[in-house]
Amino acid sequence: MALPFARCWKLYRWGTKRWGVPAVESRRGISFKLEEKTAHSSLALFRGDTGVKYGLVGLEPTKVALNLERFREWAVVLGDTTVTSGRHYWEVTVKRSQQFRIGVADVDMSRDSCVGADDRSWVFSYAQRKWHSMLANEKAPIKGIGQPEKVGLLLDYEAKKLSLVDVSRISVIHTLQTDFRGPVAPAFALWDGELLTHSGLEVPKGL
């Protein structure tokens, strides 16, 4: 099924207002929580809005009413802070999910699309015990990572790069070339279990 994609400048305007001042490059980099207003109805946030868990629609729906910022078709949620410059690093505990996508997305991407399925989001996906990078619904396999408990994400806005990081070795596993055109926010999708984010971290030495 073809995925609809429509850009909405009104949503972008509201989004930047809601997310407030964009993150700037600093020693500690981006610090964010998950924005419940964007969360699909199958997702619930926990641990001070730093974690997200998946549940069947109608069983544990988010308490937030339907709104223009909310993802309608896919189990997606965005971070509440935008990035417009600098190098930023955060980690995600992934051990309790078997199917997810993590990365970044334009704040005004279509709420009827899924991250990785359009050309305004850049993600690393995990499903069927395999990792892939994703852009515009095109997948590229990632080898040599296995099933870690936690992974890192390194965003270099000026270089237009998003990297998946092995947190045990502090080394880059795979780098996805991006095409940022405006503010981006951390992005997450999952169809099983839960994810937990860890932000406000320094970029590790050597990366």
Curated annotation (Swiss-Prot):
Q: Which residues carry this modification: N6-succinyllysine?
A: 139
Q: Which GO terms describe its cellular component?
A: mitochondrion; nucleus
**UniProt keyword list:** Acetylation
Keyword Acetylation among UniProt keywords:
yes
Report the InterPro entries cross-referenced here. B30.2/SPRY (IPR001870), B30.2/SPRY_sf (IPR043136), Butyrophylin_SPRY (IPR003879), ConA-like_dom_sf (IPR013320), E3_ligase_FN3/SPRY (IPR050617), SPRY_dom (IPR003877)
The highest taxon in the source lineage is Eukaryota
Q: Where is the B30.2/SPRY domain?
A: 12-207
Tell whether Transmembrane is among the UniProt keywords: no
- One Pfam family, please name it: SPRY
Residues that the record marks as modified (N6-acetyllysine) are 53, 130
Chain segments annotated as coiled-coil in the UniProt record? none
Per its UniProt record, what Gene3D superfamilies does this chain match? 2.60.120.920
What protein is this chain from?
SPRY domain-containing protein 4
**Species name for this entry?**
Mus musculus (Mouse)
Q: Gene behind this chain?
A: Spryd4
